[in-house]
């Protein structure tokens, strides 16, 4: 059998993840659509969750770590009164507790308690490792592992609406935040229990859901949905290099320039091609390459 020939594909696909499928399963499907040798996502969504799942192809995988560290925005639906073992609707019911009469003032008061710097205990149903194994493997066997609370930051926590025992809210949070756990903690603060019945991601760093597409749409017109590598980095200052400085950066050299507005910057060569990410060294007052990309020259086929 002939060895599979991969395409030289570099870019980002903003996938609109549907409910009921895994992030890794979708990643492999998108990879096959583009016949890309390398592919990675920028933070998995649980199977029940939907929304923005950026897929990095080819050289874009070099910046997936930057996106993993990005803040995320979600819209969540919290069902009060019923606790599940996973904190979402896919889990097994554990217990029910009566829900107090809700009011907008009560909910907003509770929400305000979770804004800012917060310590959060990660859930058992998570991919965090314990002795080399993900926690969810222990959870599925009924084994409880003690987990230390970790610092997270909640930038915004806004009530959207509520009806009977269902509350919808929007949250902008730091990396490492488990919105399932946030929902459980909100329920506890309200004097009851709860689990998420819906979770929709609308933002990852500078990327928003405005241009995301379903897998079916991507399969029909894949070229239209392949975004440039620098799309998620628009918040970084752009540094346009001359030929001499381009050569220096591409060979690992450092530049003595004025301090940039952002600690990380985008490098462009004289042809205005994005060639990598730079990092400002405060102590040395120098700009050094952090991530460089081996991209196709202008005019190369990306089909």
From Swiss-Prot:
It comes from the Bacteria. GO terms for biological process: mRNA pseudouridine synthesis; tRNA pseudouridine synthesis. Its EC number is 5.4.99.25. It is an enzyme of class 5 (isomerase). Signal peptide: none annotated. Gene3D superfamilies: Pseudouridine synthase, PUA domain. Responsible for synthesis of pseudouridine from uracil-55 in the psi GC loop of transfer RNAs. This is tRNA pseudouridine synthase B. It comes from Hydrogenovibrio crunogenus (strain DSM 25203 / XCL-2) (Thiomicrospira crunogena). The gene is truB.
């Amino acid at each position: 059998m002939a060895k599979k020939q991969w395409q030289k594909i570099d870019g980002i696909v903003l996938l609109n993840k549907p409910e009921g499928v895994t992030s890794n399963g979708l990643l492999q499907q998108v990879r096959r659509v583009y016949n890309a040798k390398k592919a990675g996502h920028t933070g998995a969504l649980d199977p029940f969750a939907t929304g923005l799942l950026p897929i990095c192809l080819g050289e874009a995988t070099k910046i997936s770590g930057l996106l993993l560290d990005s803040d995320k925005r979600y819209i969540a639906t919290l069902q009060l009164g019923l606790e599940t073992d996973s904190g979402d609707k896919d889990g097994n019911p554990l217990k029910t507790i009566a829900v107090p009469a809700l009011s907008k003032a009560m909910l907003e008061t509770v929400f305000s308690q979770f804004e800012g710097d917060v310590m959060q205990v990660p859930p058992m149903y998570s991919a965090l490792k314990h002795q080399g194994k993900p926690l969810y493997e222990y959870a599925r066997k009924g084994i409880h592992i003690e987990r230390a609370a970790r610092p997270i930051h909640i930038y915004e926590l806004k009530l959207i609406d509520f009806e009977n025992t269902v509350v919808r809210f929007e949250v902008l949070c730091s990396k490492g935040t488990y919105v399932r756990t946030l929902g459980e903690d909100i329920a506890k603060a309200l004097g009851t229990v709860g689990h998420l019945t819906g979770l929709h991601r609308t933002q990852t760093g500078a990327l928003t859901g405005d241009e995301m597409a379903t897998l079916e749409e991507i399969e029909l017109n894949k070229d239209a949905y392949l975004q440039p590598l620098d799309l998620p980095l628009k918040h970084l200052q752009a540094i346009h290099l001359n030929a001499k400085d381009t050569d220096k950066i591409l060979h690992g050299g450092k530049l003595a320039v004025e301090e940039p507005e952002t600690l990380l910057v985008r490098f462009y060569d004289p042809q205005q091609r994005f060639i990598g990410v730079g990092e400002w060294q405060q102590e040395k007052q120098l700009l050094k390459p952090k991530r460089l990309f081996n991209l196709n020259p202008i005019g190369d086929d990306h089909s």
